[in-house]
A protein has these predicted regions:
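Long, contiguous interaction/recruitment modules in multidomain scaffold/adaptor proteins
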Residues: 1-86, 107, 114, 118-119, ...
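Helix-start (N-cap) detector for alpha-helical repeat units in TPR-like alpha-solenoids
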Residues: 88, 122-123, 153-157, 170, ...
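Canonical tetratricopeptide repeat
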Residues: 93, 127, 159, 193, ...
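Residue-level recognition of tetratricopeptide repeat
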Residues: 96-97, 130, 162-163, 196
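Structural motif corresponding to the intra-repeat A-B loop/turn of tetratricopeptide repeats
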Residues: 101-102, 135, 167, 201, ...
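Conserved structural position within tetratricopeptide repeats
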Residues: 116-117, 149-150, 178-183, 216
Length: 241
């Protein structure tokens, strides 16, 4: 298979080697009759796909593989030269993607700093801290999160605490849930968060106390039913996370 930069010519009557941009070895395969030339894509993975050129009673399959990190990062850079740069959302999403995929971390930190400059809020500071943690800048990241905490809403802190539990950072999660309790006392999600943190630490009795408080303040039947089931789990010394 030869892929050429010239897509105007018909067939190979006036083939020019200098226009070849990629080549691959493949073999014909039998295929149900296809009257019109078609390209079929199958077997998708994160960084590859199989393409088949089908025509007549033949199929010519070949694999296309790309460096997904390099491809996406280049696109992010290009996007941030346009309208995406006019809002904090553009650099924030670019930084988030890089941190989530553990790639291009230095530039991700610069994008996160730009997002903070444009709109200092919990999410932008949290992403900046995530980039700093990924780069091993733990002291700086701790200070960034300390700055972010007072700017967060109830559910933002609750979600962040749950994220930390998932990452195995139970002590840090407990600090977040405690901060949420101090900032937003007597709210059912806050008490639920305290219960999750204490459950992760293995203190099921104390966790049940907070979960019972959450049950009293819970405004809807669906969540109240989930809380009841989790109280039962804690009574059996089972983690609710």
């Amino acid at each position: 298979i030869l892929l050429c930069s010239n897509n105007e010519s018909w067939g190979a009557y006036f083939f020019d080697e200098k226009e070849v941009v990629a080549r691959a070895q493949t073999s014909w395969q039998e295929h149900p009759f296809t009257e019109y030339l078609e390209f079929e894509f199958n077997d998708f993975t994160e960084n590859s796909v199989y393409c088949a050129l089908n025509w007549g009673e033949k199929s010519i399959p070949f694999e296309i593989e790309v460096d997904i990190s390099e491809t996406v990062v280049n696109q992010l850079r290009n996007d941030l030269r346009g309208t995406a740069r006019f809002s904090y959302v553009g650099p924030l999403e670019a930084a988030d993607w890089c941190v989530s995929n553990n790639t291009n971390l230095e530039e991700a930190l610069e994008w996160a700093k730009l997002a903070v400059t444009m709109d200092k809020q919990f999410q932008t500071l949290k992403t900046k801290a995530a980039a700093e943690y990924a780069l091993g800048m733990n002291k700086e990241a701790d200070l960034t999160m300390k700055e972010a905490m007072p700017l967060a809403g109830i559910f933002e802190l609750h979600s962040y605490g749950r994220q930390l539990i998932t990452e195995g950072k139970v002590t840090q999660a407990m600090d977040v849930f405690t901060a949420n309790l101090e900032l937003h006392p007597n709210k059912w999600p806050v008490n639920y968060g305290m219960a999750r943190g204490l459950s992760a630490k293995g203190d099921y009795a104390k966790a049940a106390e907070y979960l019972k408080k959450a049950e009293v303040n819970c405004p809807d039947d669906n969540n109240r039913e989930i809380i009841k089931k989790n109280i039962e789990k804690l009574g059996r010394n089972e983690d609710i996370n």
